[in-house]
Amino acid sequence: MSWLTEEDIRRWESGTFYDSYRKLGAHPDDEGTWFCVWAPHADGVSVLGAFNDWNPEANPLERYGGGLWAGYVPGARPGHTYKYRIRHGFYQADKTDPYAFAMEPPTGSPIEGLASIITRLDYTWHDDEWMRRRKGPASLYEPVSIYEVHLGSWRHKRPGESFSYREIAEPLADYVQEMGFTHVELLPVMEHPYYGSWGYQVVGYYAPTFRYGSPQDLMYLIDYLHQRGIGVILDWVPSHFAADPQGLVFFDGTTLFEYDDPKMRYHPDWGTYVFDYNKPGVRNFLISNALFWLEKYHVDGLRVDAVASMLYRDYSRKEWTPNIFGGRENLEAIDFIKKFNETVYLHFPEAMTIAEESTAWPGVSAPTYNNGLGFLYKWNMGWMHDTLDYIQRDPIYRKYHHDELTFSLWYAFSEHYVLPLSHDEVVHGKGSLWGKMPGDDWQKAANLRLLFGHMWGHPGKKLLFMGGEFGQHHEWNHDTQLEWHLLDQPYHRGIQLWVCDLNHLYRTNPALWHDGPEGFEWIDFSDRDQSVICYLRKNAGRMLLFVLNFTPVPREHYRVGVPIGGPWHEVLNSDAVAYGGSGMGNFGRVEAVPESWHGRPFHLELTLPPLAALILEPEHG
């Protein structure tokens, strides 16, 4: 009996075997296990493990076309650990299975450390209702508010001990639901030996990290979140892979998964290796991996890490090799990204793909048939950098940098954007969001509430890294839990309540969902002397007015032109006492009088609290 068919080999060789995880890796039956691995340059491959006392001579594999090796091992059962012994000339190494569905923790002996585990992926799902109604591309016209989470440091059950996948399910779902977020985005859960990489230096692309439990435990977490109405996005890292010798690097004694070109194969920023997207086996491996997480784990989307490093051959390099036309664009990576997105949406049209792309590359979220890269969303890194640069300034100097606040609206509709305040902004000495805010504690809290008010008013979906929602003092530390004790203090409870109320307003008001140009209208972006901006969000007959005062100076009788007369309701005020503010405002209601201002036929005369966001709505729209 042959494990691989001629059609399997044809698809593998053509780089279109996008469900290759069904054949490669370890696949147990009642009597033993089929093993299959890609090692085209190997002179010999055998499987060794707990079932043969780690004897590399006991179970040699047979060579097939396309550089594939396969064989059946009687008595190899689920739970057994294993590796592949690869021989190429004088080279010999014991390698972790690239397609392993589970791996042991990154500890153990030099022979058995990081061994793969024969694993069945059986699980009974209970999320049918969620899977039927999840949005995917339809989310462009729905609220999307993402809570970014590192599972190992969100909350600890005791000092230094993280929750398991199963243990964290209920408290995480309770919190996310209470806070009003629509999705959770998990930092990479794929197996990574170096905990301090936060999951971005992957060895086991098909194996959820063993630190928090089994594959079924992770399935339970995702299933539970779905049952609570919460979507799950995974960070996915096809841009580079870990340098651990047991992993993908120099897999068959040659540069197999990585580039052959020494100028291109190594990533100097991260000490990792770069995938060679030209190789059919690499494309099979990565695109299959994306589909694997969407199918087997029911994830709702993939956030693709470090896309800019894939697009440019000279990204963060002093020496690099141009493409065939002499340019800096990585043509094979571009083609891979397009094929990845096309394949995902072909098989999972209700999924989401999101690009962390930090340059001005055009059409990141445009469809491939319009010469785009095909992602559904792109992180708006320009908005993030400009807004954080602005809000960190002493308010007395903000008027000289007013364009940092307003420039993002020139390009806000060029892509389908997510506004990210991610983990990257609260690490490596950058400080926490709270720490970035100028002034004393009162001003820090007010500035942070103001930042969030503008973020939720600005066009684009929302993403906030854990801890930011209550103003954590210290930058994120993956070894400790968040500073939950700060919620004993009024300022931090107030910030948390403000984010909660912003989320609930966002989810219930269609004026905030439509991120096209017709859903946004400037009222005034030119009052740099007083550092005030005001704009409308509108959709489906609803309208919200945002008035933002970026100085600690209260402003009485501040006029704002509006298109509708009559009473306007003060929906939210970040300076409310409940949020830790001074309680200044407009007593919940103000009348728009028929006198032109800002080119509108009516105007409101408002009291602007210091460092505050006001959100108003006409009572009769």
Curated annotation (Swiss-Prot):
Catalytic reactions of this protein: Transfers a segment of a (1->4)-alpha-D-glucan chain to a primary hydroxy group in a similar glucan chain
First-level EC class: transferase
Keyword Glycosyltransferase belongs to the record: yes
UniProt EC number: 2.4.1.18
GO molecular function: 1,4-alpha-glucan branching enzyme activity; cation binding; hydrolase activity, hydrolyzing O-glycosyl compounds
An individual GO BP term: glycogen biosynthetic process
Active site: D305, E356
Pfam families documented for this protein: Alpha-amylase, Alpha-amylase_C, CBM_48
This protein's GO CC annotations: cytosol
Pathway connected to this protein: Glycan biosynthesis; glycogen biosynthesis
Swiss-Prot/TrEMBL keywords: Carbohydrate metabolism, Glycogen biosynthesis, Glycogen metabolism, Glycosyltransferase, Transferase
The family this protein is said to belong to: Belongs to the glycosyl hydrolase 13 family. GlgB subfamily.
Task of the protein: Catalyzes the formation of the alpha-1,6-glucosidic linkages in glycogen by scission of a 1,4-alpha-linked oligosaccharide from growing alpha-1,4-glucan chains and the subsequent attachment of the oligosaccharide to the alpha-1,6 position.
PANTHER family: 1,4-ALPHA-GLUCAN-BRANCHING ENZYME
HAMAP family membership: GlgB
NCBIfam families hit by this protein: branching_enzym (TIGR01515), PRK05402.1 (NF003811), PRK12313.1 (NF008967)
Subunit structure: Monomer.
Protein name stated in the entry: 1,4-alpha-glucan branching enzyme GlgB
Organism this protein belongs to: Rhodothermus marinus (Rhodothermus obamensis)
High-level lineage: Bacteria, Pseudomonadati, Rhodothermota, Rhodothermia, Rhodothermales
Encoding gene (name): glgB
